[in-house]
Amino acid sequence: MVYIQDNISVKDIFDNIEYYTDLFLEHGILIFKKLNPTRQEEWDLMKSFGDRIGWFPNSTVKGEPRLPYLSTEDEGHQTTFNRFDHAILADELFIDWHIERAERENFQTGALWHMRKFECNPDSGQTGFINMISFFEHMPKDWQDFLIKCKVCSLSQPNELGVFTDVEFSESLPQRYIVISHYSNKKPIYRPSLSTTDFLTKVDDLPPSVEDLKLFEEIRQWTIDQTVDSPNNQTWFKWSVGDTMIIDLSLMAHAVKGGFNLGERSFSRIWAHRYSFDIIE
């Protein structure tokens, strides 16, 4: 479930930060219509949430807003537009379904996105979500028990434009557990690669058996059917100028639809990570 709040100020959030932190942990995403925070308020909000749920930036991160937490340029999707030689319609995917940086150890656990420019059709550029904690909870129990023991690697890797291309398996490819514990509430999160292919490498730290491989492939296909190919399991949000979203990227699979042109839609971004990038002395 996506939580949407209207008619609220930045001060209201700070004055009730415990309440909104609890809502965030419950829903995985908070959307504040027409909140329109300043850039300093964006930074302060993310640090305040970080103090309570355990991501960085938080109050231990001193100084001005900065990389790698802050994106210094607003996102207008120039790189994504460069991938296409044709217009992407409003009912087509502009950015495929994915879980942010599933392959990284210090993956992005959260983000604040503030739509600063939106000069396209109101139905264009929608962002879709699937809560992968809830998704995992509704899977058969024997599948859950199996997936918790699985390590995988991705057989697609991004190039300099972020376009994924198929690669051969090698031991040097990053490997990860496909189910991890949430950094704050410890609930299990299912984090498959929804737009690329995961390869099963270990089950309970042992090489997978033929039966393991068959079961994993069955679950993988079912997952795609129930996420990417199942609109009924997706929630889509229509943006307007000033809308501000705080999202738990560790658990929210997301995608973006087209229908807009380069320069019509842009938003500011602050990223939260599981671990600090600062050197602690």
Task: List the predicted regions and their residue ranges.
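Non-heme Fe(II) oxygenase catalytic core, chiefly the N-lobe of the double-stranded beta-helix
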Residues: 1-243, 251-281
